[in-house]
Every structure is written in structure tokens, then in C-alpha cells.
């Protein structure tokens, strides 16, 4: 973690939230990748402004990033660094965002790195996704097979089942409370000492 990594992550999520819908309006993969690079530049500009105001180096705000946006025909992922995402596609569960490979163990890439644009990974899937789960690297060894890169179906089926009957509001208190209880339980906490953040979403009809 970094000194103000949480601030950097919040800024990245806010900028992505403002521009994510535009990705699905673009016709080609090249246009999507170009817009994703613009998202990176916009995020760095906002982080740089906050860092300058605080008189801190931008590296203090370093953060990894996994962003996913989907409609009835496509899924787009934008990623730099570790973390991953799984989606329920028309043909089953799929790992749609994979942790970035690095030369050394426990070393990752950050959105604030000088070569971040070169490290940015953008993927486009021509399928509908009705359920999406993004999570940090602390959960990955528990729910994704390291050798096959296959999602652990029982875990995701259980997690996605929480969305059944959830409200159509952006944030559902009941589902969030269930996830928090699950993540703080011994089956998870005894198997990882890293961050266990998770975001679960469904696409409304």
C-alpha cells in the first residue's frame, strides 16, 4: 500500500465513473483503447493536482485499478496492476481481468507509474454480462485457480445469489452487509493477509 493510495483509488474510480459510459458508445476496439488512455491521462491530471496541493509526490497516491463496464452486447475492462474481475457471460463464468504479471513476487504496477500508459490493459468481450465481480489481490488465490485461471464457481454462485432480490439502487445495504460479514469471517481471514475488497454488480434489464 502507499501513503495516500486510498485517495488515488477514489479519484481513479470517480474519473472512470464519469467516462465509463462513453466506452460503450465507441464502435471499434482502437477507439475504446484510445479513450481508455484518455481516462488514464485525466486521472493522472487530477491526482497530480491533489498531490501538488498537498505538497506530496504523486507516488504517495499510487494505486492499482480494475474498471469494468458492460451493456447488452459488450464488456470492456480497463486495468493496471493487480486485482481481477469475473463476469457471468452468456457461456458461463469467465476471468475477464487478470492480475498483471511482473518480474518479481509481490511487485505490482501502479496507475501513477511513469510507464503506466504502456502497462494499461484494455480488453473487449463481445458478449453480454449480467453479473460482474471485481476484487483485490488478497482474494484472488482463494477464488481463482492459479494454474488454470478458472474462477471458483461455488464462490461466485454464492456471491452472485446475494444480488437476487437486491434493490435497483447503486448501493444495496443488505447485500453489502452480507459481503462484509463473509469477508471478515475466518474462512477468508485465515487464508490471506492482504486486502480483500470486492465489488459485485448486476446488469438491470
Model-based region annotation:
Residues 93-105:
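Flexible glycine-rich active-site/ligand-binding loops centered on an Asp-His dyad
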Residues 61-62, 102-124:
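Active-site glycine-rich loop that binds ribose-phosphate moieties when present
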Residues 1-29:
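Primarily the active-site beta-strand->alpha-helix module of PP2C/PPM metal-dependent phosphatases
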Residues 87-88, 96, 109-112:
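Surface-exposed beta-loop interaction hotspot
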Residues 1-6, 84-86, 138-146:
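Short acidic, Gly/Ser-rich segments with clustered Asp/Glu that frequently serve as metal-coordination loops
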Residues 115-117, 121-205:
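C-terminal catalytic subdomain
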Residues 67-69, 79-81, 89, 98, ...:
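Short, structured patches in soluble enzyme cores that scaffold and shape functional sites
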Residues 25-86, 119-126, 189-193:
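Catalytic core of PPM/PP2C metal-dependent serine/threonine phosphatase domains
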Amino acid at each position: 500500500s502507499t501513503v495516500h493510495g486510498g485517495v488515488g483509488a477514489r479519484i481513479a474510480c470517480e474519473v472512470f465513473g464519469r467516462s465509463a459510459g462513453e466506452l460503450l458508445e465507441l464502435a471499434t476496439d482502437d477507439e475504446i483503447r484510445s479513450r481508455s488512455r484518455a481516462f488514464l491521462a485525466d486521472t493522472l491530471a487530477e491526482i497530480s493536482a491533489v498531490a501538488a496541493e498537498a505538497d506530496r509526490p504523486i507516488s504517495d497516491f499510487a494505486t492499482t485499478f480494475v474498471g469494468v463496464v458492460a451493456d447488452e452486447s459488450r464488456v470492456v475492462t480497463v486495468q493496471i496492476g493487480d486485482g481481477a474481475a469475473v463476469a457471468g457471460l452468456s457461456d458461463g463464468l469467465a476471468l475477464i481481468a487478470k492480475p498483471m504479471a511482473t518480474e518479481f513476487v509481490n511487485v505490482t504496477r501502479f496507475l501513477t507509474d511513469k510507464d503506466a500508459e504502456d502497462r494499461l490493459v484494455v480488453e473487449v468481450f463481445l458478449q453480454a454480462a449480467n453479473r460482474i465481480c471485481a476484487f483485490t489481490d488478497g482474494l484472488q488465490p482463494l477464488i481463482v485457480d492459479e494454474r488454470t485461471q478458472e474462477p471458483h464457481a461455488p464462490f461466485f454462485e454464492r456471491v452472485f445469489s446475494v444480488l437476487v432480490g437486491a434493490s435497483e439502487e447503486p448501493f444495496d445495504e443488505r447485500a453489502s452487509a452480507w459481503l462484509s460479514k463473509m469477508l471478515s469471517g475466518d474462512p477468508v481471514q485465515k487464508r490471506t493477509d492482504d486486502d480483500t475488497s470486492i465489488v459485485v454488480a448486476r446488469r438491470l434489464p
